[in-house]
Swiss-Prot record:
In plastids the minimal PEP RNA polymerase catalytic core is composed of four subunits: alpha, beta, beta', and beta''. When a (nuclear-encoded) sigma factor is associated with the core the holoenzyme is formed, which can initiate transcription. InterPro entries: DNA-dir_RpoC2_beta_pp, RNA_pol_beta''_euk, RNA_pol_Rpb1_3_sf, RNA_pol_Rpb1_4, RNA_pol_Rpb1_5, Rpb1_funnel_sf. GO terms for cellular component: chloroplast; DNA-directed RNA polymerase complex; mitochondrion. DNA-dependent RNA polymerase catalyzes the transcription of DNA into RNA using the four ribonucleoside triphosphates as substrates. GO terms for molecular function: DNA binding; DNA-directed RNA polymerase activity; zinc ion binding. The keyword Chloroplast applies. Binds 1 Zn(2+) ion per subunit. The keyword Chloroplast applies. Its cofactor is Zn(2+). This is DNA-directed RNA polymerase subunit beta''. Its main location: plastid. The lineage of its organism: Eukaryota, Viridiplantae, Streptophyta, Embryophyta, Tracheophyta.
């Protein structure tokens, strides 16, 4: 008794909470010290103790135990405020959609997590023995996430697709949910229940398949005699923890030496002591035996398996290690699927944690330990590289808050902070994110409107002539409000253009263009509201040609129309001068003509491959809706491969004499489309067949123009009714009809089977229609074929160059299909559709080794010589450095202005003006500003800015009168001077009346100067050439300007007369985009709605409302500049990386994919080339036979290791520890099959037969002839159906097929596995039934000795291969001959 008491006094009492991990450690230590029997006795006592205590405690849960956290209300308010600001920023266009989504997730997730962290301290302070508090960390019947949903907030939920729903559930289950929150909650809960059911069944089925593959793997021998092993080293990126887990329980494959001292011998099992010795001495690499290296075919030896997972000794003979391995991998999946159910679909992701201030006070920290930076959302912060403390000083107390390494401090030193304010952000652990996937986020148009963007866009490299654009830098994309007219019943019967309207001339027939019977009074009476004020001057409509509209209207960028197709150009080395001719007779003949549209940006800068002009050919114009088809056209299988038609886009060719025309085709499949309101009562059924002139809608007299098949599709707010014309064919089951959406069949094709079939004369489009699941028929639709002439002889554009200089600047013609392949095009209110546009593309030879970006300046020049007015386009190649330097020039009595600036001035509206300019070819000159003879010019102003440069003579009465005479449709007001500006986005043409706006500007001061010989300063950007203006010539600018010079986007400088006081006003340019909430004036009010400046009055602006979208580089824009979009159309596609949740519900399918050997990763494009390079190098080093052998061995070994690592990655992300040897047994079975190839026909195996790898190697050694086979990866299902036991296969899947095949082949089942013995009722060969199999005969012993001799031979071979390569060839032959003679002696 005394001895017992003495022992008890020496015992240590541990007062700690014990969890599952601690229980595992305790059990393993008990087994090590006391053995299995005594340990089971102790565990029974622990179980009985727990049962008694739980019964005595009898914890129950009542509704009063659910105590809500008091800080929840203001935490939710804080998160709502941040979400509101985020929504505002997104609405203003400051934050794009992906950024908004990520920040919203972070805000609510951080709030929810902080509430969860506050939960336990709150319970400990108020009610430590609360049942909810006790259950929350028990791990048996509840977890923190469940209790958090009960008393905290449910937070963010996942939708059925697994995506996060943006609207969080702010209530908890104790408070009760609102209707909206309940519906969102049902999404997640349903997803949780379904996931649990599906994933549990998936995990169970996975376990069954795994056990099926390896049920016959037993430990049958002590040692298989292998000399192979795999190397384990911490240098291969393996952490020390994983290194230790990999080594413990294994057996060494080779001796381990440190210098001359051996610290580990071959075939010794590795314990924790030996691992510590390896780490201390840094012994690496360490070669260990694994199931991969075992020489057995259908079993495994004791030493290759290692220690038993239950107790510390080597595994016993007769252990069913295969079943243990299958269950070890499948069981964690079965258990962990319940995690989804526990959280009920609540979104759980990893974001940065926040540190909050414990009380009000002033924060202080050492500024020398932090460095200024920005958060990932762009907010200023301080980064700390070491752990340190920040101090918060309040009146009575000081708080020290620990800030971990690499955290971001979000407040400044000495700043006053409030209690629970976020002061720091701890970086999220990157190790939690194992899987990243690229996700596409589509942005859809919220309203109907016209697209504009504020930067250069370029085509994607894959589709250079499509409507998909990429933006090179962050910019805004605008949707200007307004849509196209769908009904022409209320439109006036002639084309009356209002200010800045874009009217489609093709929507009216020529006879409706004008009506001479209408008087001005009738027009004014009809359209009084359109012009706003009654006192506005009525326009003169008496001349009919003023009303005739342009032939086409599609304006893409700021452009100026030239309605003449005849262009001649003289070409110089770095410059074009293209004279433009205007045919006045055409205007008098009242014929609307189609012409070339010149397209030059506002700043006049063109880059390489810019489009400078385009021409809409009327041949490619359609009046009906339809579908375009081009690219690689799908043709039915009855056509040979050579008949595939590929649209190759435009051919690049130099502008020499090009006589050959290359013709490409594209196809247009016409169809009739009606867009009807969503509530329209339609009178035809879906998939019905109607005739011509059938009434479609009950209350509207809409009739079909063609007969055919009707397809009705319901959109968001409308019905889309399509009518397909064509023939309908019903086919039997014999004919195979492709299930694709449609197939084009070329002419000259007929069916080979049917005798009476005729060959096709034209292209047809075959479409499969399936009205019900069982029935289908085929619709054969007519196709309109268009041919694109891809070459135009550009030599006709230029005259012969006498100097024969090198052609640097070049023009080429590109045919541009305006609609993407397979796109459904719908015409609106009888408008015509332009399918192909011919574009004139400017290009030049880029200088090599030049970091300077080359640009081209394009400008319009107007020259009058001897009363002859000529217009030119001047295109000049200029090298411009990336950063401009500013210089000022002071010259007495003159102001310098560059030739380029002058060209840009006159580019504004050259065809409207009748001004005279004489340009003299001098490199540098002055701009004289003498008074006119009648001294009417009162002030002169020069402005220069990034986007505009204007010269304005104010109050020049002669100019005003002349303009009034020339254009009676332009009313001029005489306040202080007109600003008749052509809107940058809307361009005028001569055939319609001039699109002018009336921008009246008031000046605070007017400068009356008698002498103009004063100094002017001009901000100039070199290098440019200067032009000289004669002092006596008349200076004219169609865009007289005011002194409005400053805005919030561009900084423009104004250089006034030196006597005047310099004041700055905001510049308001027409077409300028303004974001909401921006101050336009210093003391004015904010802009209440985003939009584009439409009209500028004296005291007001008219803004066309627009919606801005922020677009980041790499985002894809769908559609052309200026294209009209409808509500719900796809505008932008963002591509961003999203961290996949590490939940096992996402991991299990990945494990299954790996084990079933399905492709999960994208394959490298140059994989084949790399493999060929590897083969060539290894053959060169080792010779042909050894190169192939070692290459094949390495491939199999590496693929096995890779598969094990991928599966471990999934399980480790969940904190599940599975020993590698279990995975290795499974992977060994997946990779142990080879496919007999047809290269060498052997008598033993059939070509295409699956055999074991070791069996194939042994058969090759025994037979005189070689067997050709290919290593192959078989999934676990296929491996289960390719075993040596047909009883096992038949009991798994495809029973009848397997048994019939086995009977035909006469297979014999040797009943070596567990399953076949269970099926037949025999004793299974494991455990006590194992000894029945093991009784060695003499013959068996002889085989064993032979194998050992062979092993020694292989060992010598490997030494020679690695150390004495030169001796190898001679020694190998000699050794093999000796070995053969020894065998012959034994046989004889």
């Amino acid at each position: 008794m005394e001895v017992l008491m003495a022992e008890r006094t020496n015992l240590v009492f541990h007062n700690k909470v014990i969890d599952g991990t601690a229980i595992k450690r305790l059990i393993s230590r008990l087994i090590d010290h006391f053995g299995m029997a005594y340990t089971s006795h102790i565990l029974d006592q622990v179980k009985a103790l727990g049962l008694r205590r739980a019964t005595a405690t009898s914890i129950s849960l009542g509704i009063d135990d659910l105590l809500t956290i008091p800080s929840k209300r203001w935490l939710v308010q804080d998160a709502e405020q941040q979400s509101f600001l985020l929504e505002k920023n997104h609405h203003y266009g400051n934050v794009h959609v992906v950024e908004k989504l990520r920040q919203s997730i972070e805000v609510w997730y951080a709030t929810s997590e902080y509430l969860r962290q506050e939960m336990n301290p709150n319970f400990q302070m108020t009610d430590p023995s609360n049942p909810v508090h006790l259950m929350s960390f028990s791990g048996a019947r509840g977890n923190a996430s469940q209790v958090h949903q009960l008393v905290g907030m449910r937070g963010l939920m996942s939708d059925p697709q697994g995506q996060m729903i943006d609207l969080p559930i702010q209530s908890n289950l104790r408070e009760g949910l609102s209707v909206t929150e309940y519906i969102i909650s049902c999404y997640g809960a349903r997803k949780g229940v379904v996931d649990t059911a599906v994933r549990t069944s998936d995990a169970g089925y996975l376990t069954r398949r795994l056990v099926e593959v390896v049920q016959h793997i037993l430990v049958r021998r002590t040692d298989c005699g292998t000399i192979r092993g795999i190397s384990v080293s911490p240098q291969n990126g393996m952490t020390e923890k994983i290194f230790v887990q990999t080594l413990i329980g294994r057996v060494l494959a080779d001796d381990i030496y440190i210098g001359l001292r051996c610290i580990g011998t071959r075939n010794k099992d590795i314990g924790i002591g030996l691992v510590n010795r390896f780490i201390t001495f840094q012994a690496h690499p360490i070669y260990i035996r694994t199931p991969f290296t075992c020489r057995s075919t259908s079993w495994i030896c004791q030493l290759c398996y290692g220690r038993s997972p239950t107790h510390g000794d080597l595994v016993e003979l007769g252990e069913a290690v295969g079943i243990i391995a299958g269950q070890s991998i499948g069981e964690p999946g079965t258990q962990l699927t319940l995690r989804t159910f526990h959280t009920g679909g609540v979104f759980t992701g990893g974001t940065a944690e926040h540190v909050r201030a414990p009380s009000n006070g002033k924060i202080k920290f050492d500024e020398g330990l932090v460095h200024p930076t920005r958060t990932r959302h762009g907010h200023p912060a301080f980064l700390c590289f070491i752990d340190f403390y920040v101090t918060i000083e309040s009146r009575d107390i000081r708080h020290n808050v620990n800030i971990p390494t690499k955290s971001l401090i979000l407040v400044q030193n000495d700043q006053y902070v409030e209690s629970e304010q976020v002061i720091a952000e701890i970086r999220a652990e990157t190790s939690t994110f194992h899987f990243k996937e690229r996700v596409q986020k589509h942005i859809y148009s919220e309203s109907e409107g016209e697209m504009h963007w504020s930067t250069d866009g370029y085509h994607t490299p894959k589709y250079p002539y499509s409507n998909v654009h990429l933006l090179p830098k962050t910019s805004h994309l605008w949707i200007l409000a307004g849509g196209l007219c769908r009904s022409n019943s209320n439109i006036v019967s002639f084309s009356l253009h209002k200010d800045q309207d874009q009217m489609n001339a093709n929507s009216f027939s020529l006879k409706d263009l004008f009506d001479l019977s209408l008087t001005n009074d009738q027009v004014r009476h009809k359209l009084l509201d359109t012009f706003g004020k009654k006192d506005r001057e009525s326009l003169d409509y008496s001349k009919p040609y003023r009303i005739i509209s342009k032939g086409h209207w599609n304006l893409i960028e700021p452009s100026t129309y030239i309605r003449q197709e005849n262009s001649l150009a003289k070409k110089r080395r770095n410059r074009f001068v293209i004279p433009l001719q205007y045919d006045q007779e055409q205007e008098n003949k009242l014929i609307p003509c189609f012409g070339i549209s010149i397209k030059i940006p506002i700043n006049g800068i063109l880059r390489r491959n810019s489009i400078i002009a385009y021409f809409d050919d009327p041949r490619y114009r359609r009046s009906s809706s339809g579908i375009t088809k081009y690219g690689i056209v799908e043709v039915d299988s009855i056509v040979k491969k050579e008949d595939l038609i590929e649209y190759r886009g435009a051919k690049d060719f130099s502008p020499k004499y090009q006589t050959q025309m290359k013709v490409d085709q594209f196809f247009f499949i016409p169809e009739e489309i009606h867009i009807l309101p969503g509530s329209s009562p339609i009178m035809v059924r879906n998939n019905s067949i109607i005739g011509v002139d059938t009434r479609l809608v009950l209350n509207i007299n809409t009739r079909s123009r063609v007969g055919g098949l009707v397809r009705v599709e319901r959109k968001k707010k409308s019905l889309e009714l399509k009518i397909f014309s064509g023939d309908i064919h019903f086919y039997g089951e014999v004919d195979k009809i492709s299930r694709h959406s449609g197939i084009l069949i070329p002419p000259g094709i007929g069916k080979k089977d049917s005798k009476g079939s005729k060959k096709l004369k034209n292209w047809i489009y075959v479409q499969r229609i399936t009205p019900t699941k069982k029935k289908y028929f085929v619709l054969v639709r007519p196709v309109v074929t268009y041919e694109i002439a891809d070459g135009i002889n550009l030599a006709t554009l230029f005259s012969q160059d006498l100097l024969q200089e090198k052609n640097n600047v070049q023009l080429r013609i590109v045919n541009y299909i305006l609609y993407e392949n397979g796109k459904s095009i719908r015409g609106i209110s009888h408008t015509s559709i332009q399918l192909v546009r011919a574009c004139l593309v400017l290009t030049w030879d880029q200088e090599k080794k030049s970091s300077i970006e080359e640009k081209v300046h394009a400008s319009f020049v107007e020259i009058r010589t001897n009363d002859l007015l000529c217009y030119f386009i001047r295109i000049e190649l200029v090298k411009s450095t990336l950063s401009y330097t500013e210089k000022r020039y002071d010259t007495a009595g003159s102001g310098l202005i560059s030739n380029n600036e002058l060209d840009r001035i006159h580019r504004k509206n050259p065809f409207d003006s009748k001004a005279k300019i004489q340009i003299f070819p001098q490199h540098q000159g002055t701009l004289g500003t003498l008074l006119n003879r009648n001294k009417e010019c009162q002030s002169f102003l020069i402005l220069s800015s990034s986007n505009c440069s204007r010269i304005g003579p104010f109050n020049t009465s002669r100019y005003n009168n002349a303009t009034k005479e020339l254009d009676p449709m332009t009313p001029i007001r005489y306040l202080l001077g007109p600003l008749g500006t052509i809107v940058p986005r809307i361009v005028n043409s001569r055939s319609s009346y001039y699109l002018r706006t009336y921008n009246q500007v008031f000046l605070k001061k007017s400068f009356l100067l008698e002498n103009f010989q004063q100094t002017f300063q001009v901000l100039q950007v070199p290098p440019f050439q200067y032009c000289f203006l004669d002092e006596n010539s008349r200076i004219y600018n169609p865009d007289p300007c005011s002194n409005i010079i400053w805005n919030s986007f561009h900084l423009n400088w104004c250089f006034l007369h030196h006597d005047s006081c310099e004041e700055a006003w905001p510049i308001i340019s027409l077409g300028q985009f303004l974001c909401e909430n921006v101050y336009l004036l210093k003391y004015g009010s904010r802009i209440k709605k985003s939009g584009q400046i439409f009209i500028v009055h004296v005291d007001s602006l008219v803004i066309r409302s627009a919606k801005p979208y922020l677009v980041t580089p790499g985002a894809t824009v769908h559609g052309h500049y200026g294209e009209t979009f409808y509500e719900g159309d796809t505008l932008i596609t963002f591509i961003y990386e999203k961290s996949r949740s590490g939940d096992i519900t996402q991991g299990l399918p990945k494990v299954e994919q790996i084990l079933e050997v399905r492709s999960i990763d994208s394959i490298s494009m140059n994989l084949e080339r790399r493999v060929e390079g590897w083969d060539e190098r290894i053959r060169r080093i080792l010779g042909i036979p050894w190169g192939f052998l070692i290459g094949a061995e390495l491939t199999i070994a590496q693929s096995r290791i890779s598969l094990v690592n991928k599966i471990q990655k999934v399980y480790r992300s969940q904190g599940v520890q599975i020993h590698n040897r279990h995975l290795e047994i499974i992977v060994r079975q997946v990779t142990s099959r080879v496919l007999v190839s047809e290269d060498g026909m052997s008598n033993v195996f059939l070509p295409g037969e699956f055999i074991g790898l070791l069996r194939a190697e042994r058969a090759g050694r025994v037979l005189a002839e070689s067997i050709c086979y290919r290593a192959i990866l078989l999934g676990i299902t296929k491996s289960s159906l390719n075993t040596q036991s047909f009883i096992s296969e038949a009991s798994f899947q495809e029973t009848a097929r397997v048994l019939a095949k086995a009977a035909l082949r006469g297979r014999i089942d040797w009943l070596k596995g567990l399953k076949e013995n269970v099926v037949l009722g025999g004793i299974i060969p494991v455990g006590t039934g194992f000894n029945k199999l093991v009784h060695r005969s003499k013959q068996d012993k002889n085989i064993h000795l032979k194998i050992k001799r062979k092993n020694l031979f292989e060992l010598e071979m490997s030494d020679i291969l690695l150390h004495h390569r030169e001796l190898f060839c001679s020694c190998a032959q000699e050794l093999s001959m000796r070995h053969q003679t020894n065998l012959l002696r034994n046989v004889s």
